[in-house]
């Protein structure tokens, strides 16, 4: 795909507006997982190093649009950036009518979702954003699937619209994994909801040699095989669809599972066959035999696409399945690409970031790209590159 890249431009003295993905978890005013900020830092540093007048912004959480709410302020991100950068960093709350930025200074523009019209890709708001800059840098792959004012609309009106290094790297890595993957290719789709990922499973079934399902998705497949899943999270209305996928694809369904009688961090885990799940139990992880079976499959893979954990890894007693799978991916010689918020949290927890070939910052965008959908922000950048 042909887009203008930020790395090809001279940014010295230019007003540069970077739309990053700084949507990080915050607790008590502190950033609790900095993966997305870390991923955005090289782009920010490159613009500062070139002597640009740099503005960066993002959404954070889901505030009521058009209203300021301290709970969703980018202030914790600003404090984090102050620790990491030697350049001056400041937060600007009201910026739609203009903002002064010095060369080598970083101005963080407050949460874009505080601006009315952001989510609807409002043209007036988009033009106000565009008026702030000479160069618009789209670097938030995680929101590239949404046509919003700060990810899409601004790019139509800015003098120059380009892809930041992070976005460009995402597109290159995903292209490598999906267009001509080294084989065998294994795709892992986990997490809680089947409905949101069934189209992904369908698309992946056409390109992957082996599909692996985990989490609530696996529970639906266990039910499709006629097993009782008790009180487990699963989607009864999608059992027939799971049956269809089982007949058309090679999908290993867990043979053993870890169950509990309550969904809680302190719940004790019982390892048992899928044949023995009781009516008052819920499946919260795959069992050891199932996890080892998946580890063997992953050992022989040449390309691995990983989206979603195979169990409730946030609870220590139901972590083992995801840990075995995560370590198998880390130990594999395959080109591995991982995406999705829960997946990133698991990678952090098990300390394997340096052993994954490429970690995507996108969740929904990652899945939509996998499905072969057009990402509005990318389409806009391609359009602007033609002019």
Swiss-Prot record:
One Gene Ontology term, aspect cellular component: cytosol
Keywords of this entry: Acetylation, ATP-binding, Cytoplasm, Glycolysis, Kinase, Nucleotide-binding, Transferase
MF terms in GO: ADP binding; ATP binding; phosphoglycerate kinase activity
Subcellular location: Cytoplasm
Residues reported to bind substrate: 21-23, 36, 59-62, 113, 146
Metabolic or biological pathway: Carbohydrate degradation; glycolysis; pyruvate from D-glyceraldehyde 3-phosphate: step 2/5
Pfam family, one: PGK
InterPro entries: Phosphoglycerate_kinase, Phosphoglycerate_kinase_CS, Phosphoglycerate_kinase_N, Phosphoglycerate_kinase_sf
Residues that bind ATP: 197, 314, 340-343
Catalyzed reactions per annotation: (2R)-3-phosphoglycerate + ATP = (2R)-3-phospho-glyceroyl phosphate + ADP
EC number of this enzyme: 2.7.2.3
Main localization category: cytoplasm
Modified residues (N6-acetyllysine): 84
GO biological process: gluconeogenesis; glycolytic process
Top-rank taxon, per record: Bacteria
PROSITE patterns, per database record: PGLYCERATE_KINASE
Subunit architecture: Monomer.
Family: Belongs to the phosphoglycerate kinase family.
Protein name in UniProt: Phosphoglycerate kinase
Organism: Shigella sonnei (strain Ss046)
Gene behind this protein: pgk
């Amino acid at each position: 795909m042909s887009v203008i890249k930020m790395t090809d431009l001279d940014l010295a003295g230019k007003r540069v507006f970077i739309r990053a993905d700084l949507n990080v978890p915050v607790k008590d005013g502190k950033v609790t997982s900095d993966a997305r900020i870390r991923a955005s830092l090289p782009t920010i540093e490159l613009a500062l190093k070139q002597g640009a007048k740099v503005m960066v912004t993002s959404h954070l959480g889901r505030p009521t649009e058009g209203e300021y709410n301290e709970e969703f302020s980018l202030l914790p991100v600003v404090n984090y950036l102050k620790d990491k950068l030697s350049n001056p960093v400041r937060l600007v709350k009201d910026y739609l009518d203009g903002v002064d930025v010095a060369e080598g200074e970083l101005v963080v523009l407050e949460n874009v979702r505080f601006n009315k019209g952001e989510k609807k890709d409002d043209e007036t708001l988009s033009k106000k954003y565009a008026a702030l800059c000479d160069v618009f840098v789209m670097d938030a792959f995680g929101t590239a699937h949404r046509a919003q004012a700060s990810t899409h609309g601004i790019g139509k009106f800015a003098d120059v619209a380009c892809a930041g290094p992070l976005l460009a790297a995402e597109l290159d890595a995903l292209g490598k994994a999906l267009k001509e993957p080294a084989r065998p290719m294994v795709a892992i789709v986990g997490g809680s909801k089947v409905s949101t990922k069934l189209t992904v499973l369908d698309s992946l079934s056409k390109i992957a040699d082996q599909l692996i399902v985990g989490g609530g998705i696996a529970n639906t497949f266990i039910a499709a095989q006629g097993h009782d899943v008790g009180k487990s999270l699963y989607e009864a209305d999608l059992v027939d669809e799971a049956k269809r996928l089982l007949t058309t694809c090679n999908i290993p369904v867990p043979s053993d599972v870890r169950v509990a009688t309550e969904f809680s961090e302190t719940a004790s885990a019982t390892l048992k066959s899928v044949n023995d799940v009781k009516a008052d139990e819920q499946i919260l992880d795959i069992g050891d035999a199932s996890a080892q079976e998946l580890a063997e499959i992953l050992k022989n893979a040449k390309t691995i696409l990983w989206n979603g954990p195979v169990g409730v890894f946030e609870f220590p007693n139901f972590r083992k399945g995801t840990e075995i799978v995560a370590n198998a991916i880390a130990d594999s010689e395959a080109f591995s690409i991982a995406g999705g918020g829960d997946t990133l949290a698991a990678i952090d927890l098990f300390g394997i970031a340096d052993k994954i070939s490429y970690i995507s910052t996108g969740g929904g965008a990652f899945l939509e790209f996998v499905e072969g959908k057009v990402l509005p922000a990318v389409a806009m950048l391609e359009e602007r590159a033609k002019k």
